[in-house]
Amino acid sequence: MDTQAFKQTLHKSDRYNRRGFGSANKRAQALAEAYQSGLIGSIRENGNLLEHGRLKVKLAEAFGFCWGVERSVAMAYETRKHYPNERIWITNEIIHNPSVNDHLRKMNVLFISEEKGVKDFSVVKDGDVVILPAFGATVQDMKLLHDRGCHIIDTTCPWVSKVWHTVEKHKKHTFTSIIHGKYKHEETLATSSFAGTYLVLFDLEEANYVSDYILGKGNREDFLKRFSKASSAGFDPDKDLQKVGVANQTTMLKSETEEIGRLFEKTMLQRFGPAQLNEHFLAINTICDATEERQGAMFSLVDEPLDLMVVIGGFNSSNTTHLQEIAISRGIRSFHIDTPERIGEETNTITHMPLEGGELLTEENFLQNGNISVGITSGASTPDRVVEDVIHKLMKIGENF
């Protein structure tokens, strides 16, 4: 499919909307009423510090809702107001935050079901309204909805759209897109649908494996088996790794994306020489400003003396997981929770998701005796009001134990 031509057709349609229905001021007011927190505002004014009895809370300099998430959530709320009687669907969670998605369900926004990675669009009818979430949607899903006569409300984060433009540029110049991301993640699925030939790499270890293959040190059968689910159809590592460009899932760890980019630049330089480097490697920065800012703030926070860390965000939130990864890498006792209810203020316990995933774990004697310093941050999909509720629970434990 000519994805650029399709996007031009879609954007000209009177059944497509990516600008919302009201002014930016109205959107900001609606979100403030729903999600902002007076307590968080006060803590920010006090240098991101709260002292309450034996408890000291330190907030990261930057955390919580980014502007892309704010825009997406506000547009989803506006959609229900603009279409009070129509059936409204959303192709996935609007963002990776359970409280926000539950609020949409209460507004009678319907979520398209998915089984084994396949969405059931049979429930969507001509004239229905369909919201595309902040992560975007695959170009194939967009075309299906457009052809069906749906009203499409596109809340895709502009930073995600920027990555789509990047991989389309790779495709135009016959470069393979090396996408740093999780191949099952909604955003990466959408991005890869706009690419031509692509390979999704989860981390630096996988990038080094591919680099070695480019330099003649790998095994073709092993390569194809390892990346069978993370590459474009018919991917041929002997042919398709001659020209590469790097892009990323916007929520990945910034430092790792940069390191992967440098690795492939060095690899292609070694393979083809400086005179031909630009013919075989294309470097474009697709790192999201908000992701970079929040990760930078987290690195600063973990440099301070902390007894423990609480990271708040959806368990399926990539950007939240990477914030937790930063704390764990510094040896800090750190807990990833998705809602305030994971903290038992009457029992001094916390139920959390370990970094490696799997089953939830419950920690006894969560806040230990004596004065204690707690660092707090949250993912880009977590409202300030949720962070406030977590702090209130910590304060109660500090008072009672």
Swiss-Prot record:
UniProt KW keywords: 4Fe-4S, Iron, Iron-sulfur, Isoprene biosynthesis, Metal-binding, Oxidoreductase
Residues at which (2E)-4-hydroxy-3-methylbut-2-enyl diphosphate binds: 96, 185, 250, 317-319, 381
Name of the top EC class for this enzyme: oxidoreductase
InterPro entries: LytB/IspH (IPR003451)
Gene3D superfamilies registered for this protein in UniProt: 3.40.50.11270, 4-hydroxy-3-methylbut-2-enyl diphosphate reductase, catalytic domain (3.40.1010.20)
EC number, UniProt record: 1.17.7.4
Cofactor mode of binding and number, as noted: Binds 1 [4Fe-4S] cluster per subunit.
Active site positions: 187
Pfam family, one: LYTB
Residues that bind isopentenyl diphosphate: 96, 185, 317-319, 381
GO terms, biological process: dimethylallyl diphosphate biosynthetic process; isopentenyl diphosphate biosynthetic process, methylerythritol 4-phosphate pathway; terpenoid biosynthetic process
CDD domains: lytB_ispH
Record pathway: Isoprenoid biosynthesis; dimethylallyl diphosphate biosynthesis; dimethylallyl diphosphate from (2E)-4-hydroxy-3-methylbutenyl diphosphate: step 1/1; Isoprenoid biosynthesis; isopentenyl diphosphate biosynthesis via DXP pathway; isopentenyl diphosphate from 1-deoxy-D-xylulose 5-phosphate: step 6/6
Keyword Zinc-finger assigned: no
Signal peptide: none
Positions of [4Fe-4S] cluster binding: 66, 157, 288
GO molecular-function term, one example from the UniProt record: metal ion binding
Swiss-Prot/TrEMBL catalytic activity: isopentenyl diphosphate + 2 oxidized [2Fe-2S]-[ferredoxin] + H2O = (2E)-4-hydroxy-3-methylbut-2-enyl diphosphate + 2 reduced [2Fe-2S]-[ferredoxin] + 2 H(+); dimethylallyl diphosphate + 2 oxidized [2Fe-2S]-[ferredoxin] + H2O = (2E)-4-hydroxy-3-methylbut-2-enyl diphosphate + 2 reduced [2Fe-2S]-[ferredoxin] + 2 H(+)
Known cofactor(s): [4Fe-4S] cluster
Amino-acid positions noted as binding dimethylallyl diphosphate in the UniProt annotation, renumbered to this chain: 96, 185, 317-319, 381
Family per similarity comment: Belongs to the IspH family.
Function: Catalyzes the conversion of 1-hydroxy-2-methyl-2-(E)-butenyl 4-diphosphate (HMBPP) into a mixture of isopentenyl diphosphate (IPP) and dimethylallyl diphosphate (DMAPP). Acts in the terminal step of the DOXP/MEP pathway for isoprenoid precursor biosynthesis.
NCBIfam families: ispH_lytB, PRK13371.1
Name under which the protein is recorded: 4-hydroxy-3-methylbut-2-enyl diphosphate reductase
Protein's organism: Prochlorococcus marinus (strain NATL2A)
Gene name of this polypeptide: ispH
